[in-house]
């Protein structure tokens, strides 16, 4: 990935997070899908995220690249809604990924508290 692509991904997530947070704050369920989803509660947001994860897996196994890309975008969108509803930003996720960088997946998993 080029530095430009890396920046574009970060910019896209930053913009998405800002829009989601603004719509959550506005709380206009009649005008905003984000607000209407949030009005149904965290459980509904989590359920929708699970549905999108399943659709992403199915697309990966049975559909074309465009379908997988679309489902991945839906998954990231709904994850952003859930994170924002919990008050967690993509900066926290990026910090956790940076912390794990260079650590073996097996070692990282073994170091987690039970």
Q: Where in this protein do the model-derived segments appear?
A:
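Flexible "arm" and connector segments at domain edges
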Residues: 1-71, 76-114
């Amino acid at each position: 990935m080029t530095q430009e692509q890396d920046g574009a991904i970060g910019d896209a997530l930053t913009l998405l997070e800002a829009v989601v947070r603004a719509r959550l704050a506005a709380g206009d369920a009649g005008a905003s899908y984000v607000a209407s989803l949030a009005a149904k509660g965290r459980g509904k947001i989590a359920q929708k995220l699970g549905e999108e994860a399943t659709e992403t897996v199915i697309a990966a196994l049975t559909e074309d690249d465009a379908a997988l890309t679309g489902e991945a975008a839906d998954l990231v969108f709904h994850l952003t809604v859930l994170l924002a509803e919990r008050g967690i930003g993509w900066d926290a996720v990026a910090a956790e990924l940076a912390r794990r960088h260079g650590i073996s997946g097996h070692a990282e998993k073994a170091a987690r508290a039970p």
